[in-house]
């Protein structure tokens, strides 16, 4: 990597963030595309967020990525939001366009790009969970022309989830069905007629539990995806593969959301195949 007086900076901003693999991905991409850039991780306190955003302009940076807890907190300090960032109510990428700071959310696009030979337009989807990742997938699916979405959450989370779905319907005219995860017969009935089943909860990170009962029967054409990438194969994905279903983990989402951000910053395509190889060697 060449560092000189013309090197432009990009960073991921969060707390905690030292464990992030984003610097690995983006610095590989800068090198592979002969882009004079460097990508670092900044672990900051909330009180430093305003100054950090100001530094994007001050140092003529490409921009920044954001992770928890700053995806929502950054919004008041930006000049403009993309459609999907407005719908999600969260930003994971800030682009410096000649001093104008524009907020995007590339998580949903990254998720759908990582699915092999699959387009969501006209399809039926089941989403488990309603946190930040789920919201980005939900909003992107609506923008991309999904025909039906069923969101399943634990019954204790129903009331907390409903206002966001109501607001989404106001903004898009699209009605999302909200169901309780405990109603297994309802889950089975909806899975039977769906094209895509997504785990957007953290259940499975421990390598022990699955978010759905193992007696659920999957239709053979159903694509199953998990946003978790460590462990590389969660119990949820193992269960889906044992029924013969295609199953995808969250590492591709991480790579392709980064590729979207890289293109917004540099105008260049990230060499995803090359970087995917390095990532799978590192995490498989």
UniProtKB/Swiss-Prot annotation:
Catalytic activity entry: shikimate + NADP(+) = 3-dehydroshikimate + NADPH + H(+)
Gene3D superfamilies: Leucine Dehydrogenase, chain A, domain 1, NAD(P)-binding Rossmann-like Domain
Biological process annotations from GO: amino acid biosynthetic process; aromatic amino acid family biosynthetic process; chorismate biosynthetic process; shikimate metabolic process
Parts forming coiled coils: none
Sites where the protein binds shikimate: 20-22, 67, 92, 107, 229
Pathway per the UniProt entry: Metabolic intermediate biosynthesis; chorismate biosynthesis; chorismate from D-erythrose 4-phosphate and phosphoenolpyruvate: step 4/7
GO molecular function: NADP binding; shikimate 3-dehydrogenase (NADP+) activity
Entries under Pfam families matching the protein: SDH_C (PF18317), Shikimate_dh_N (PF08501)
InterPro entries, per database record: Aminoacid_DH-like_N_sf, NAD(P)-bd_dom_sf, SDH_C, Shikimate_DH, Shikimate_DH-bd_N, Shikimate_DH_fam
Keywords: Amino-acid biosynthesis, Aromatic amino acid biosynthesis, NADP, Oxidoreductase
EC number assigned by the record: 1.1.1.25
Enzyme class: oxidoreductase
Catalytic machinery residues: 71 (proton acceptor)
Sequence positions that bind NADP(+): 83, 129-133, 227, 250
UniProt record similarity statement: Belongs to the shikimate dehydrogenase family.
Quaternary data: Homodimer.
Annotated function: Involved in the biosynthesis of the chorismate, which leads to the biosynthesis of aromatic amino acids. Catalyzes the reversible NADPH linked reduction of 3-dehydroshikimate (DHSA) to yield shikimate (SA).
Protein name: Shikimate dehydrogenase (NADP(+))
